[in-house]
């Protein structure tokens, strides 16, 4: 298994996947000319090259120094950051990734998981931000055998606690293992 992993990393197809300049400007623009968008494009290229697991982290943009808290860790100015910085990047990159995978016939065999490690407090703090909150958060799944158009579970009216069908991290892990890994790999 270790040799197989090394062979994948060292393959010409994997090395070529990192050459984003091989993509046309229209495709690169569709993903968004920001780090997250180009990281999603790289993820698609790595999947095409045969990678079995790709994790896309959300890198901080070099000019993003508006607040001390990076990325989705919105302890300050939550509404402004989500509206002006974060959602526009997510809204360009994620749908484009899903469309590209579908057009290439890869979405059915690729599970896309969008999540953070916890949620945010239901109410703003004194700095207009939201702090860490482990009681309730959202995860999105697409492709890989997931039937789309579903919402499973619900929060209370302020998004503070689960109100219907609470799921735990181990439930998500079991779903991922069931959909993508199967018994042959456990």
Feature annotation, model-predicted:
Residues 1-183:
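Ligand-binding pockets and gating/stacking loops
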């Amino acid at each position: 298994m270790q040799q197989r992993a090394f062979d994948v990393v060292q393959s010409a197809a994997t090395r070529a996947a990192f050459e984003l300049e091989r993509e046309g400007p229209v495709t690169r623009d569709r993903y968004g000319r920001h780090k997250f968008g180009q990281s999603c494009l790289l993820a698609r290229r790595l999947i095409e090259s045969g990678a079995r697991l790709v994790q896309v982290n959300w890198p901080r943009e070099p000019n993003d120094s508006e607040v001390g808290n990076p990325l989705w860790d919105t302890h300050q100015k939550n509404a402004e950051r989500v509206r002006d910085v974060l959602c526009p990047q997510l809204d360009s990159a994620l749908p484009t990734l899903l469309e590209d995978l579908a057009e290439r016939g890869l979405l059915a065999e690729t599970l896309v998981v969008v999540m953070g490690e916890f949620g945010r407090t239901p109410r703003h703090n004194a700095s207009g931000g939201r702090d860490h909150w482990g009681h309730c958060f959202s995860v999105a799944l697409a492709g890989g055998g997931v039937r789309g158009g579903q919402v499973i579970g619900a929060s209370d009216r302020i998004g503070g606690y689960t109100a219907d069908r609470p799921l735990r991290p181990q439930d998500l892990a079991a779903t991922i293992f069931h959909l993508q890994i199967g018994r042959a790999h456990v």
